[in-house]
């Protein structure tokens, strides 16, 4: 049965239906205060996942093919849940620092910032998890540096299967760091977004149809479809932050089969030469 309450959680742990995994990410990029950063591209354990591939072609992301934070093998027909997480840092430089753990679903590589022509996506591949798109968000991750300051928008299909939806215009920041979320800059009203704001009334994305730059630059970014699962804030080096999802939230986040898990963070300074340590416990239903 699904894990839905205290008894089911206790039974899962007593019966050995649990596992704990440990990770360490070591960013090599000089991150900037107030700019969201995708730790999936950083060295460490797990190894980096770079958002390269055939330009503009929808590419499915999975644990079996791409790695990510390993959460164990498929337990189907049982369901797997995130029991708790603990985060810590080897340096105080980038703290306090919000973190978001997400399921990375699909990406569109190498959007060219050097043209204002509409760039059409190849959607031969489709979502394999959260297939209705509900709650699925889009982030633009830098894979080649830019001058910054240009705007763009996306044309997408929403959670109801309605195509031709148009996002709000977003402005790129000026960071040259690979892995930075190009639309983020918390000190600037116009481009403070981790995720690209959708058209009013929409709550998710099934696919991206096209991207249009409103001015040219020299960089490249990839669009990544993600499903946020949990968030926390690491406040200081001497105090690891643990979150128990049984006692501190209304439900245990489900980890879908073959999910690619990884993190984004909002550092308060440079993270290069900093180790970010992650402990993660999962349980599964009987």
Predicted regions and their residues:
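Polar, enzyme-active/binding microenvironments
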Residues: 1-286
């Amino acid at each position: 049965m699904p894990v839905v309450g205290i008894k089911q959680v206790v039974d899962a742990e007593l019966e050995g239906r649990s596992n704990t995994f440990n990770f360490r990410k070591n960013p090599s990029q000089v991150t900037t205060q107030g700019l969201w950063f995708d730790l999936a591209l950083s060295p460490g354990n797990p190894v980096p996942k770079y958002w390269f591939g055939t330009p503009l072609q929808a590419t499915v992301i999975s644990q079996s093919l791409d790695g990510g934070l390993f959460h164990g093998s498929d337990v189907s027909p049982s369901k797997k849940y995130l029991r708790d997480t603990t985060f810590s840092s080897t340096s105080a430089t980038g703290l306090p620092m919000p973190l978001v753990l997400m399921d990375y679903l699909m990406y569109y590589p190498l959007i060219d910032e050097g043209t204002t022509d509409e760039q059409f996506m190849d959607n031969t591949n489709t979502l394999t998890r959260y297939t209705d798109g509900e709650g699925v968000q889009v982030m633009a991750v830098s894979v080649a540096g830019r001058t910054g300051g240009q705007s763009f928008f996306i044309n997408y299909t929403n959670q109801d299967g309605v195509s031709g939806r148009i996002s709000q215009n977003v402005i790129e920041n000026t960071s040259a760091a690979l892995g930075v979320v190009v639309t983020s800059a918390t000190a600037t009203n116009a481009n403070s977004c981790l995720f690209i704001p959708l058209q009013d009334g929409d709550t998710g994305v099934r696919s991206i149809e096209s991207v249009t730059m409103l001015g040219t630059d020299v960089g490249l970014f990839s669009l990544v479809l993600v499903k946020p699962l949990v968030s926390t804030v690491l406040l200081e080096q001497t105090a690891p932050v643990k979150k128990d999802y049984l006692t501190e939230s209304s439900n245990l986040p489900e980890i879908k089969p073959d999910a690619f898990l990884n993190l984004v963070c909002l550092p308060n300074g440079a993270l290069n030469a900093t180790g970010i340590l992650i402990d993660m416990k999962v349980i599964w239903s009987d």
